Regions:
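Glycine-rich cofactor phosphate-binding loops and adjacent beta1-alpha1 units
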Residues: 109, 136, 142, 148-234
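Cysteine-cluster motifs in flexible loop/terminal segments that predominantly coordinate metals
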Residues: 29-79
């Protein structure tokens, strides 16, 4: 429940003078139990998500123990709420977080005009990366996706130039043919070793190609270390986003720089959440983003 748009009912005195009850806001992602310290190097740079003095538990280390936006009411640090412009809808506000994750990955990757970009995974983060890569001037975007039905959905978004089957036996050769000899940048949004290593092999043979890891692996990750060294690949990790990027996304929505509503697969009520998760599991990832309406 970290991707949210809400209406404040009560704003603690002296915390955020720009907000008042009834404003429409989007909530910058954070651990609701522990406010960023405000004095570490990350906080001083405005990167609260990477505060070195916070303890954040994830799916790998335990539960957050808080419903986040999976409830009618919740709490949020007031300084982490961004008031939405009048021409940004509530649904768009709820999409700010995943598109900030994509923006962060693209900025970490240092996408340049005319880059050929390979993205592994066609979920909301992969599509966010594709949208921002295009905005930053990428000339050719290829998305690799396992699910054949999802591949057709991705083609309908018209943001990727090529959508390929992640399980194709000749995938590496396909990628080299499509890109005319290799990509400038690999962005991994799935965390699957075989896919990542294939992506490494599909980078250009020239020096200093780039690879960015966004997806978290679910097990040990054997890396094609030899290929990494021989190609002198610049490998970066990308986690979350910072507050400036979050605000940039909202401003980009308001200006029309990016369009996000096409990625909303369907809408469900709060009481339908459990059934919604089961439907997502049964559909094996056909949804890109589901909006939960809490009222």
């Amino acid at each position: 429940g970290v991707q949210t748009c809400a209406l404040p009912i009560l704003v603690a005195p002296g915390t955020n003078r720009a907000l008042k009850p009834g404003d429409r806001v989007a909530g910058y992602t954070q651990n609701v139990f522990q406010e960023p310290c405000g004095h570490c190097e990350a906080c001083l740079a405005g990167d609260w998500d990477h505060c070195t003095n916070r303890r954040v538990f994830t799916w790998k280390g335990g539960e957050l123990g808080h419903p986040g936006a999976y409830s009618q009411y919740t709490t949020w640090f007031p300084h982490s709420l961004v008031k939405l412009p009048d021409n940004v809808t509530n649904e768009e506000g709820a999409m700010a977080e995943p598109f900030a994750v994509g923006l962060h990955a693209i900025q970490v990757s240092q996408v340049k005009p005319n880059d050929r970009v390979l993205i592994l995974g066609g979920g909301i983060i992969g599509m966010s990366c594709a949208e921002w890569a295009r905005t930053f001037g990428a000339s050719e975007i290829t998305v690799s996706e396992l699910n054949p039905q999802k591949r057709e959905i991705i083609r309908g978004y018209q943001v990727a130039d090529h959508v390929v089957a992640a399980d194709a036996p000749d995938l590496e050769q396909q990628l080299l043919d499509i890109s005319g000899g290799g990509y400038d940048l690999l962005i991994d949004c799935v965390g699957v070793p075989s896919a990542f290593n294939t992506g490494l092999r599909a980078l250009k043979p020239e020096f200093y190609m780039r690879a960015t890891a966004v997806g978290l692996p679910h097990a040990q990750f054997p890396l094609d270390y030899e290929r990494l060294v021989l190609k002198q690949v610049l490998l970066r990790g990308s986690k979350g986003h910072n507050f400036d990027e979050f605000k940039t996304v909202i401003n980009a929505m308001a200006s029309g720089r990016i369009s996000v509503k096409k990625y909303i697969s369907r809408r469900i009520k709060l009481e339908e959440v459990q059934a919604g998760f089961e439907a997502m599991k049964a559909a094996r990832g056909l949804d890109t983003k589901v909006i939960i309406e809490t009222q």
